């Protein structure tokens, strides 16, 4: 076998190994586009859960809240207080739906990965997992945060918003621009890494000791999942508030 053939064989082996590590995915073909079906399926399920809970809790509203209505009002009050704390008393109200949607979607997605056995459902390729277990979802959430960040600043300050990029000196222009994109992206990688690591640890422990040991880790995963949703929503609100205030 020639030296070139050996090198080609080596590269093929590395390629096969990378395929095993990355895993397989299930796609839908829509025209010339491939849609990542695994993420869409689980995301739609999470959205359906949120909509169902909202309808059930608010279909019979009372002046004095009880039961599900009381719980929903508590959650909304928590989200409102979080948004007001980070954005400010004068500007927070229009951003409560955005921050609330972000928090609830991430929270339910994270908990679905910790509580629901997605992998029992077989697909032609790949396997189901929590939406936030996929980097595509977390990066999409980061991009939404970036769009909200720029919109808030432009809506509040107009074109003068871009003046912050040359403060305190124009030399920092590239760094200031890069910072606005890296902050939301750091959120996405943190969320993705924590949720993926939690599911992998629980899966490994269940395969080794299937009865007792994984239970504490599952409770720890639930706690971590809630904290990650809170961190993402809090920092997203803080970035939006920062863009309207115009300081770093």
UniProtKB/Swiss-Prot annotation:
It is found in: Plastid, Chloroplast thylakoid membrane. GO terms for cellular component: chloroplast thylakoid membrane; plasma membrane; proton-transporting ATP synthase complex. One of its GO terms (molecular function) is proton-transporting ATP synthase activity, rotational mechanism. The keyword Ion transport applies. It is a multi-pass membrane protein. SUPFAM superfamilies: F1F0 ATP synthase subunit A. It comes from the Eukaryota. Gene3D superfamilies: ATP synthase, F0 complex, subunit A. The chain crosses the membrane at residues 37-57, 96-116, 135-155, 200-220, 221-241. The keyword Transmembrane helix applies. Its main location: plastid. Keywords: ATP synthesis, CF(0), Chloroplast, Hydrogen ion transport, Ion transport, Membrane, Plastid, Thylakoid, Transmembrane, Transmembrane helix, Transport. Key component of the proton channel; it plays a direct role in the translocation of protons across the membrane. F-type ATPases have 2 components, CF(1) - the catalytic core - and CF(0) - the membrane proton channel. CF(1) has five subunits: alpha(3), beta(3), gamma(1), delta(1), epsilon(1). CF(0) has four main subunits: a, b, b' and c. PANTHER family: ATP SYNTHASE SUBUNIT A, CHLOROPLASTIC. Belongs to the ATPase A chain family. This is ATP synthase subunit a, chloroplastic. It comes from Marchantia polymorpha (Common liverwort). The lineage of its organism: Eukaryota, Viridiplantae, Streptophyta, Embryophyta, Marchantiophyta. The gene is atpI.
């Amino acid at each position: 076998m020639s030296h070139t053939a050996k090198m080609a064989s080596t590269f093929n082996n590395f390629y096969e190994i990378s395929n095993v590590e990355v895993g397989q995915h299930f796609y839908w073909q829509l025209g010339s586009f491939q849609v990542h079906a695994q993420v869409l399926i689980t995301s739609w399920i999470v959205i359906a859960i949120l909509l169902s809970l909202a309808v059930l809790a608010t279909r019979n509203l009372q002046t004095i809240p009880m039961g599900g209505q009381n719980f929903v009002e508590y959650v909304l009050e928590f989200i409102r207080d979080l948004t007001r704390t980070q954005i400010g008393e004068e500007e927070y109200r229009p951003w409560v739906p955005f921050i609330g949607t972000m928090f609830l979607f991430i929270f339910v997605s994270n908990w679905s990965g910790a509580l629901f056995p997605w992998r029992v459902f077989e697909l032609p390729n790949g396997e189901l997992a929590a939406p936030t277990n996929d980097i595509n979802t977390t990066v999409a959430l980061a991009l939404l945060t970036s769009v909200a960040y720029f919109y808030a600043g432009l809506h509040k300050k107009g074109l003068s918003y871009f003046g912050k990029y040359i403060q305190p000196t124009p030399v920092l222009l590239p760094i200031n621009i890069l910072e606005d994109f890296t902050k939301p992206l750091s959120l996405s990688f943190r969320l993705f890494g924590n949720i993926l690591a939690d599911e992998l640890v629980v899966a490994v422990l269940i395969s080794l000791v299937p009865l007792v040991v994984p239970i504490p880790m599952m409770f720890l995963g639930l706690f971590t999942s809630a904290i990650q949703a809170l961190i993402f929503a809090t920092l997203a609100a803080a970035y939006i508030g920062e863009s309207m205030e115009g300081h770093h």
